[in-house]
């Protein structure tokens, strides 16, 4: 089992979280003190790593405020392809959605090392992209990441396709959150909660979308 104290996860996404909670007038200094992190250092080098233990404490701190119950959703919505460093820029150069998703699968460990991605095709010849935890995470942290990744996935796919194209489906293992109505505002994707037997996310895309350029 991987040691939770070893820095593995790029800090860039959690810096975005700090921006979000600061905008809600929540003290970020108390968070930094609790996690023993130097924000200035991480802002200067967003590819630096934090440990799973720090991430879990980070999420616990953020979610102890009731107003932050939609924080994972807002984090996902704030993440664009350019947020993923070099991998994101490489995705923008792909010829088709299928090519982009294969690139995501290949380099997902660079985006979020605590999760893994895989692709297969179902009997209807639809592409299914599965994203599952690679590490043992506390339930609160796990569900937070599943929601944030699912929303970011929708956001990123919509950067690559035209809004008038056919819709696609995103299945999640987590129950529908209290702010579930916000998901209805996200275009093109249809979200299905409590729909997987194992923790994670499954994206299903038709052939017509896969060939979109």
Please place each PLM-identified region on the residue numbering.
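N-terminal low-complexity or simple alpha-helical regulatory segments
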Residues: 1-127
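Alpha-helical bundle regulatory/interaction domains
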Residues: 97-213
């Amino acid at each position: 089992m991987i040691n939770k104290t070893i820095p593995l996860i790029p800090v860039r996404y959690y810096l975005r979280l700090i921006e979000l909670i600061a905008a809600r007038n929540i003290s970020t200094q108390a968070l930094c003190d609790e996690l023993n992190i130097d924000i200035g250092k991480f802002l200067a080098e967003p590819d630096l790593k934090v440990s799973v233990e720090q991430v879990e404490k980070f999420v616990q701190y953020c979610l102890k405020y009731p107003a932050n119950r939609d924080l994972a959703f807002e984090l996902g919505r704030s993440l664009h392809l350019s947020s993923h460093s070099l991998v994101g820029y490489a995705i923008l150069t792909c010829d088709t959605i299928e090519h982009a998703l294969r690139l995501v699968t290949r380099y997902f460990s660079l985006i979020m090392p605590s999760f893994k991605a895989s692709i297969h095709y179902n009997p209807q010849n639809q592409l299914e992209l599965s994203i599952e935890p690679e590490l043992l995470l506390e339930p609160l942290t796990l569900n937070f990441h599943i929601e944030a990744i699912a929303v970011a996935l929708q956001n990123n796919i919509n950067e690559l396709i035209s809004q008038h194209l056919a819709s696609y489906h995103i299945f999640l293992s987590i129950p529908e959150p209290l702010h579930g109505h916000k998901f209805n505002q996200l275009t093109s994707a249809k979200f299905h909660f409590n729909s997987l037997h194992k923790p994670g996310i499954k994206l299903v895309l038709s052939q017509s979308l896969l060939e979109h350029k």
